[in-house]
Structure formats: structure tokens, C-alpha cells
Amino acid sequence: MALFDGWVHCPRCANELTRRDNAVECGSCGFVLYAHSAVTASALPEDADGRVLLARRGIEPFRGSWDAVGGFVDEGEHPLDGLRREVLEETGLAFDPHELLGIWMGRYGLDDRATLNLFWTGRLAPGRPQPADDVAELRWFGPDELPPPRELAFEGLVATVLAAWRNQHP
């Protein structure tokens, strides 16, 4: 449970914490903190020519690899609101989600955090997408022009998602 590495004392009463299978617990005040998968919301924006927009990551992990546009959903944020926020932050354009492509489990970062990843297809607002935030480059790819798996982020996750997208575009 790498998520709780370094957790020794209770944030409420400062007494020692005890580790359980997927949580830390304080025997003094009863505080319990459970480990949960982090939720992500990502977009596969499509254009009128049937292409998909991918983002080249500008940060670790997987800096320089191709990824879907998106990121982590904030605490208490609806996944669709997080999706729209992330797409706007990374492309400068609003996103209209059309269809939930799928939900996949993944891992993120040096602490190997479990993630629950939601992917939508849809359209960007008119305009030219501009890379921003943690994106180094944005590029449109046709179904037969997708980057090879070795150039994709997150050890098979993005490749699996793009295969699902490509199956919708024979």
C-alpha cells in the first residue's frame, strides 16, 4: 500500500496509525483513511475527417509519449466537469462529449497509484487547439496513422483505449 508510505501519525490526534489491508487506522480516535483509486477523465476529440486528437506529454511520467487529452478529476468534481476542465486547460478549447468510450483501470506515477480511467469521444469547439498546461504538442491522427504502442503513455492503457476507438472507425 504505497499510498500510505510515510504515514505514521494520525492527522486528527497525532497518535500512531496502524496499517490495514487498504487503509490506515488510529486506535485512539477511530480515524480511518481508505485507499481509493484516483479517477481520471480523458477525451478523444474527433474532427470532421474522422481523426483523433492526441497530446504529447510534457511532464513525467511518460514525458514525450502520446496520450489522450485529460487528467485527474478533482475531489467532489463530476467526471464530465473534470473532463471539460482538463480539455480546456490542455487545448484552449471547450469539449462536447458525445459518447463514453469505456472505463479502464490503470496505474500512475512513481507510487504506482491505481487509477479508474474514463474516456469519452466528442468534438472540440471551433478553433485551433493549442498545447498548454502539461502538454508539449497536440496532433490529429487518422485511424490508420496512430502512433505505435511504444510511443504511447501508460504501459498499454492508451494503446488499449486507441484500439477500442479504432474498432469504431474501421
Role assignments for model-derived ranges:
Residues G27-V52, F72:
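Conserved N-terminal beta-strand and adjoining loop/helix that marks the start
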Residues R19-R20, A94-I103:
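A short coil-to-beta-strand element that immediately follows conserved catalytic motifs
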Residues M1-W7, Q130-P170:
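Nudix hydrolase/Nudix homology domain
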Residues W104-R128:
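Active-site-adjacent beta-strand/loop module that shapes the phosphate/pyrophosphate-binding cleft
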Residues M1-G6, N15-D21:
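Short, flexible, mixed-charge glycine/proline-rich loop motifs
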Residues D47-E89:
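Conserved Nudix-box catalytic region and its N-terminal flanking loop in Nudix hydrolases
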Residues C10-C13, C26-C29:
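Short cysteine-rich clusters marking metal-coordination/redox-active sites
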